[in-house]
Amino acid sequence: MNWYEDFLKKFFHDPIDKPFNIPGHERRAKEYAEYFGVSGIDEGKYSDQIASCMERSLLPRDIKQDFTEIRHPLSEEKIDVILNSQKSIEEISSCLEKISNSYKNLSDKDKALLIWRNLLEEIIEKIQDKDLKKYIPILPADTRVPDHSIWEHLKVTTAINAFENYQNNSLFLFTIGPVQSFISQARKAQDFYMGSFMLSYFTFIAMEEVIENCGPSSIIYPDLYKQPLMDWYLKNKGLEPKNFNPGHITLPTIPNRFVAIIGTTDKNKIEEISKNMIIKIKNEIKRAKEKILEELKIDIKLSNTQKKILQNQLSDFPQIYWVAIPWKKGDNDIQIDDLKDFFTDDKINNWKELYKFANEKGEHSPNIGFLYQLFYTALEKSMGARKNLREFEQKQEEGRKCSLCGERNVLFFWESKNKNKFLKYNPMACDLTSKIEQKYLTDGEGLCALCFLKRTFEIYLEKEFGSIFKDFSFPSVAEVACADFKEKAKELPEFKEYENKFFEYTRIPYLKIHSLPKLKLKATLEGSWFYEENLSVKKFKDELGVSVNSSQIENLKDCLRSLYAKAGKPKKYYAVLYLDGDNMGKWLSGELLPEIQYAYNSEVWGKLPKEFKGENKDKKESGLIQLIPKKILTPAIHSAISTALRNYAIEFVRKIVEEEHLGKLIYAG
């Protein structure tokens, strides 16, 4: 069975309106599945059981609760909900029936991909009840433990392989790097940005192997829903993701790592998938290199020796690591004791007590899903151990080092005065002086193959993504520094007079500039030309290649002084704003999650027996509070963290920096 056939059966196992009427949810699930031409949804019950155990295994028997509130997954906050259950079910059912008409002639694969990506937004679009509409994305999967949505539950359910071989899954972690050094080795804002984007882009290239073999819902962290690169992937498959903004592709929102549930425990299959990921990344780098050299017409100039140096300098990038924790040991489910090498004895014993507690007092006996937090922690520890095994190939390079990284020898340079600055120590370096744009190499700069790839990667991106990356660049620091001056001065007649004289004397009808987004429509002159000290015969010759005389320079200065008198002088300083969210590792590991009581509906927590909660001081037996004081880490928690980061990066940061203020966003993700 293909992943998409599995997906459809598991996705429709629970209806999205389940919280409104739990006793009738199975009948509605079959009805909605039929709308979309899906049958056999009962086969998804084992995947559903594992996903449910991950999310809500610590409930006693016979606890029932109406849909009255929604809990925030990462805090103590809650929302009280008052909705008419019957009307809500009727409206959702009607919406699904109408929406399903556009899915009936699709292949199972396209149907699965579009249901995963578009169904939620299509329902929101068609729902008429405004109160119901706002709750659709966060309708809880269980009214008793309403801290995870039905959508997150269905995502996890569809990720779990529990058809032919019950619980046949592995938790998988993949990472590429180096991160800090690769991004920080920069001389321009564009270097910072492109270092971030390349790591994000290559991580997604690796993800494609999981997407194509297991489906997009198998990627647990980051959640690929509405991720720009995932939407672009769907576009390339001939599908239309709803409300997709191609401009968001420029935001590198995919981190340099991902966690996935892979539907196999076979070591050879896992190794094959991992090997294919590495091959995909290496092939993408090769394609990028070849396309860039071809576009810059460098490929025909390189000797065989230079090509060999280029290949050697790219061969160990990126560093790629992966680890997997199978959920089976031989033919049996993995047990808590099988993970004892990763934890202290106290931790193992505590989890054994918790498992026993859930087994004896819980609504259902726990299954392998109960151990997700242990699996994830063991996975991270395995990755830490793997990274300590540093693989390297000894390479000896004698010569002048790269201006950017200082690690590898210069292979490409621009030097207009003293070529021996590079050729004396690097006789095989390629002289690109006056042969490419100075945005890729400035005078006196020499780059290794990897840093040259980073500097010119936009050329490849323009070929891959089209106009999104056309003329991609960042404003100069002078443009940023004088932005508030330009905004204040642009409507003054003196501003127009200065611009007119500038173009008259230079005889240049138009200058290509990279302005701040907020000033883009009004910008005609680059910021540096609004600083009086930059108005010199030499500067015009060096920067624009034009000759102006001293009299014209004085006239321009007089015009500029008149403008200063009205608008003030432009500032010579700018700020770099660095905003970092601390403790991401602790959030992902569950260390900072709220107390266990905040997972439950507040009425349910009040109804739980004191001995179950651990509030009965007369009894020596441990309850929830003693055994698991904080919420258990689940895939839904990982999804919530990912969604918050994605929404912040895509919907808020750029708007705040570029639309509301005079700034330029370099990186957010």
Label every PLM stretch briefly.
Residues M1-G669:
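Regulatory/sensor and coupling segments of signal-transduction and defense proteins
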